[in-house]
Amino acid sequence: MRKKATEQWIAKQNEILPQCDYQHITYTMPAALWSFFKANRFLLNTLSTIAAKILLKIAKKKKIKIGIFTALHTFGRDLKWNVHIHLSVTRGGLSGNELTWKTIYFKKQSTMHMWRLAIIQLLRQTYKKGKLTIPEEYQSTIHHLTSLNRILNPEYQKKWHVHFAQPQKSHHHNVNYLGRYIKRPPLAQSRLLHYDGKTVVFRYLNHKTKHHELFRCTTIEFIQRLIQHIPKKSFKMIRYYGFLSFRLRGRLLPRIYRLLDQMPKTPKQITFTSLSLQFLRTDPFECILCGSRLVFKERRHKRKFRT
């Protein structure tokens, strides 16, 4: 069911999103700040909006209406808590009068500065309101705003990693990447190498060394690492902004389609057969003996016996 939902989402986005250049951006933050968002999970709800508003603000100054979709991620390859945002933005948008399509570019350095300031301000303002829970690792050192700033100020002086991928001529690459990236579980079954009832061993890619490494932990630690990434019920992992927001897309997307000479198509229906053909190269309704088409005849339900 999860695979079908993922492919259905990808198919829908590929048909709805405008055919234009896209820029994929990954917003990260220093590891020293991750625990603040683990201890204050309600703040995760604001991160996508902060990331999107940075680009919306830049575009607004140029009188251009852009489209954005984002995805929140909380885990690294080794299942540790690692908060970051994946964002795709159109490299063009509607002019102020909504009559023409204008090109726009974003600068990595200024984007990083605005993201860094916004996150630091978020933590400071939340603390001033008395709503910030201090992570366990900082409880012995943070007792007032001044001591909090002793933690935040050095991080503000650092260069934060905001990655700009190579621009894509179409949204398909970003949609396929984000769809499978967000909809999949934190750890693919293929990466699990060993389990003996007490110990779990899995493989992961170390981004620093660029090599695959093995991670060994107890069963309890593995479960703890895994369940920390379960989002709150109804939490929106993927969000839309600008002309892709649900508030504006109904009015603006038809205009954009006309300007880009694009004819939107009805998303392809994802079925059990299409998934089997795509990933298993097998038609489930073809007889393995004679090659004839199988015909559905009846469905039998398992009987429940009373005890």
Each model region followed by its residue ranges:
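Beta->alpha loop/short-helix hinge microenvironment recognizer with preference
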Residues: 1-307
